[in-house]
Amino acid sequence: YMLHNRQNYDFSVRTSSTRTNKTESGNGENLYGTYMSDGATNIRVNGNEYADIFPVWEWDRIPGTTLPAGEKRNPVDWGSKGTCIFTGGVSDGKYGVMTFKMDDYGVKAQKSWFMFDNEVVCLGSGIGSNVPTDIVTTVNQCHLDGNVWINTGKALQQATQREFAFEQAPQWIWHDSIAYLFPQGNNIKLKMDRQKGNWAKINFNYPATEISMPIFNLVINHGQSPRNASYAYIVVPGINHPEKMKTYSCHHLKIERNDTEIQAVNNRKSGILQIVFFKPGTFDNEEIKVKALKPCVVQIKKSKGKVTDMQIADPQNQEKLKPGVDVIIL
């Protein structure tokens, strides 16, 4: 679990591993919370984004997750261990990166979240599935609050339809003080409609009275049985009006790698480079060369061209890694 707090927002990621239990289901509660420990994210600016939303949630579209279409009821009471070994992160207390190598429900994916002052960069690679249904990465599913604006690169338009599909993603989508940028141009689907449900579906102790709420539902669709698919999106919270996106630029953020060996993001404004090594290897962007002798997560701080700080961690929680020994700056 990693929580990233800033003055204008907070962002959290929840994962599981072979060392931890997933969410529990007992006493007739949390009946569809199966996927809540599989990379679930919360993006909050005003604090009410998910308030009492759960009766109408599509539980196969939990924000942050990469999953097969179709809700799945929790099969085991009181929790079960996760299936993934490579899960964890690194932080200096201000910036951090979280990673999750998923292999469950017939889906494989390598997912990481790179957290900076004003943005969170979300990357996925190596996405594959033997499940004969669409595999979907959910960007967000929250209350629909106010207008939605879409910048296609050619025009800025207010979303008036209930549903949009983009084979090539727009530059950004704005809703409720949060902007979502799509630098990779994935297949994007957006729904803005009322979703129906009831509390009894997820908790036997509550009434089955139907509830209906307007929901903002934004996903990346990888299609059926993808092979080595990937995604990239950037969350920019705290943008209180779409007009402010006219002066916003993410050019200081560079996605250096997003493949099955390395995921890396370079924030040239803050001098922070974050790297996930899924296997031993070398990262080289012509500005810095980093060699990892073991799988790890690395965060490097540079100032005036010199490395001033570095944190490393083993997401497999097997050993304490050492700078200059297990991770070497060449």
Per-segment meaning from a language model:
Residues 1-296, 302-308, 316-319:
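Extended polysaccharide-engagement surfaces of secreted carbohydrate-active enzymes
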